Amino acid sequence: MKRSILAASLFLIAYGLSLSIPRVQAQPFPNRPIQLIIANVPGAQSDISGRLLAEEMEKILGTKIVVINKPGASGTLGTDAVVRSKKDGYTIGYPSAGGIVYARVLNPEAVPYDPDKDLEPLGLHLFFPNIAAVQAGAPWKNFGELVDYAKKNPGKVRVGTIGQGSIDHFNLEITQTLTGAQFTSVPFKGGESVLTALLGGHIEVAFDVLSKYLPHVNAGKVRILLLTKKKSELPDVPTITELGYKQELPSVWMALFAPAGIPEEAKKVLVTAIEKAAKNPELKVKIENMGNIVDYKSPAELKKIMTEDYERALSIAKKIGLRKP
């Protein structure tokens, strides 16, 4: 009898204690800061646009987003850091097409990840329109005149790009194939080197990113002959398809990724926040004033762009000997 009373008493005490202890429930995502890895140096166009997007996402998510810059190796260092991060949604990346597409086309053994298997696409944010530019005093007033001259004078027109295997190099090769014109490719090491060479008269044409050239266009020093994507500030500058050619030229893009395997809840929250932030009208104006084009694409659309860009670049690389068949 005493044992029964004792057992009952212990049960009641334990039950009472269980009621007094608050139950630990899973908190909704996110409940702590998120890291955003940008695969470029502070102050670069991609860094600025990524930070602006992060600020808007903070308002939507109600949590801090800590930006970490990891530049180097054509964007693959920062991208690899995302791949190797914990698969919990608290580390995401903002790489360019370079680290996702072009680095593995040119030098696949140096890329330690497979974007198709190791990364979860969250959405494409923007495009950096690529251009064909000449000095304002150049004899060619439009792209057609440049092509006609290059056809009549094979190899005489020097075209600068930021290096072999860059998107601009691939655009040059596509342009030659489409038009039948023959240019001389002059690869540089990136940065402002192509623009400097154009202004100095060391090359006749620059295939590069628009944003660097806009101040010189406004100053009357540079003329843009071709865009890979239409820009409202340059309504009279055509894309190559507007000139009747059947294939578009690719543009540099910036997108957001997480490591593959993050929880579905985290993915859903991040994708929704990215889309809402990217489509914010005030943010869009800020970023487009830098010469870029905000054109949000869903994860599925981003996946399609990745595949198409890679297959096209790989085909060209094999054709011109940058990659073994």
Identify the function of each model-found stretch:
Residues 57, 81-90, 105-193, 240, ...:
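Hinge/capping helix and adjacent helix->loop/strand transition within the periplasmic-binding protein
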Residues 13-23:
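C-terminal segment of classical bacterial N-terminal signal peptides
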Residues 127, 212-279, 308-311:
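C-terminal lobe and pocket-closing loops
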Residues 268, 284-304:
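Mature extracytoplasmic/periplasmic domains
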Residues 298-324:
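Extracellular/periplasmic bilobal clamshell ligand-binding domains
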Residues 26-118, 156, 164, 177-209, ...:
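N-terminal (or domain-start) structured segment
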Residues 1-4:
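Positively charged n-region of N-terminal signal peptides that target proteins for export
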